[in-house]
Amino acid sequence: MANTKASPDVSVQSFYIGLDIGSVSLNTVLLDDNYNIIEDYYDYVHGKPFNMLYDRLSSVLKKYPSATIKGIALTGTGGKLAAGLIGGVFVNEIIAQATSAGRLYPDARTVIEIGGEDSKLITLEKNPEDDHARLVDFEMNSICAAGTGSFLDQQAKRINVPIEKEFGEMAMKSVNPPRIAGRCSVFAKSDMIHHQQLATPLHDIVAGLCFALARNFRSTVARSKEIKKPVLFSGGVAANIGMVRAFREVLDLKGDELIIPAHHASMGA
């Protein structure tokens, strides 16, 4: 899936490519010399991230000749290995997320990033040397997938609700989300079965799952951290409007205290 701006004159410009290689998706951005986002792509990797990397780079380089590419940087779980394969520069994903948030949204003081296999809380402060924000502190989830996007994916498959769009829209219909265990997928499944037996409406169960993930994040990743406002919510899960609602309510965020970046899935790249 691509998000493309007006095509620049490739004969007179040079570009940078950023790649975030995760367990679920490959996120690619093309930047110009002024760090403007020219194009960005979100591709599901389907268990073959390096095959998708090859296909995406081939596609980009057909449009933007290699002579115009000044640099390639990579991050994510597959970033270090891929950097060795294609000769790019590997960047730690905490640094990548903090840098993009600090440059594009300098007023943000907390970053919540939830991807397919991990979740992060990043604290920022204003850098007195420029107009950007800089990294102060961070925390990540444990090895358990309960606080990540895969938690929602697993539960969505169990109740046969497409995760891409319908899941979030369905959650927004709920006015009484039931409490569902969010710390363990096994317990969540048990709670879901229980609520189905009670004839709890499906949209309420879906909303309950969103709130379960948000509460799990608050009580684990953010348990010892102050969540300063405004909060920037990035990662693929930020596309889920049910999760946006859940974080607003769980963290008591009003109006512009919660920022959803236009390129929320590609912030790491």
PLM regions: where:
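Phosphate/pyrophosphate-binding loops at sites that engage ATP/ADP/AMP, CoA/4′-phosphopantetheine
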Residues: 57-70, 217-229
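A mobile "lid/hinge" subdomain adjacent to the ATP/sugar-phosphate binding pocket shared
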Residues: 166-204
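Adenine-nucleotide phosphate-binding core of ATP-dependent small-molecule kinases
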Residues: 190-219, 262
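Glycine-rich phosphate-binding loops at beta-strand->alpha-helix junctions
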Residues: 78, 223-250, 260-265
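Glycine-rich phosphate-binding loop plus the immediately following alpha-helix
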Residues: 48, 126, 134-172, 262-265
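Short glycine-rich, Thr/Ser-proximal phosphate-binding strand/loop in the N-terminal lobe
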Residues: 13-58, 132-138, 142
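Gly/Thr-rich phosphate-binding beta-strand-loop-beta motif of the actin/hexokinase/Hsp70
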Residues: 5-34, 108-128
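Short beta-strand-loop/turn "lid" adjacent to the catalytic site in phosphate-handling enzymes
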Residues: 33, 41-45, 60-95, 122-123
